[in-house]
Amino acid sequence: GRYAICKSATAAKDQTYALYNLTQHQLAHTLMPVGEYTKDKIREMAEEIGLPVAHKPDSQEICFVPDNDYAKFIEENSNCRIDEGNFVDKYGNILGHHKGITHYTVGQRKGLNLALGHPVFVTEIRPETNEVVIGENEDVFSNRLTCRNLNWMAIEDLGAQEMRVSAKIRYSHKGASCTIRKIGEDRVECVFDEPQRAATPGQAVVFYDGEYVVGGGTIE
């Protein structure tokens, strides 16, 4: 048998998306005692035993970036130099100037400061040329992605067969039906039944079979 994790009792607080990369060795030594409780029940239990965090408001930010300025955090805690660059369209035409690629993500519309007469969105980020590609909303949708750095949980390996799963491409994504198949030793192709918005390179894609985590990888 294999160790696996399943979704929590409260979908809004489910953390399986962030835990897909746990190994079998780690899972064998892991207990998750609050997975069957709602957040309200945990607060009630905390209050009963006098924990001061019982009424602490939920955090809406990255827990280790208190001012939510993640771009500044990256610059201060890495060797990355964040330079200004160009907004371009898919043909390479320059549309304006951006303040550094760490300030943007695929699918973003707000904060671009581009007056083009119609709504535009980030469709791609090109770190090798320091360009942020801008396009229409439909350009953000795709019915296919590939991923690498795979970790399998409920199964030992995908092998040569295809598998029907539900895939989440971000924490807040509700999941979408798709077919996955291996296209290399450490690569998987994921083909969705319906196009999905803003599958972003560097983010995790996590595969589910019902409530159980099958595995996942890093979107290319």
Question: How does the language model describe each region?
Answer:
Residues 1-213, 218-220:
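Nucleotide-activated chemistry modules centered on ATP-dependent adenylation/adenylyltransferase
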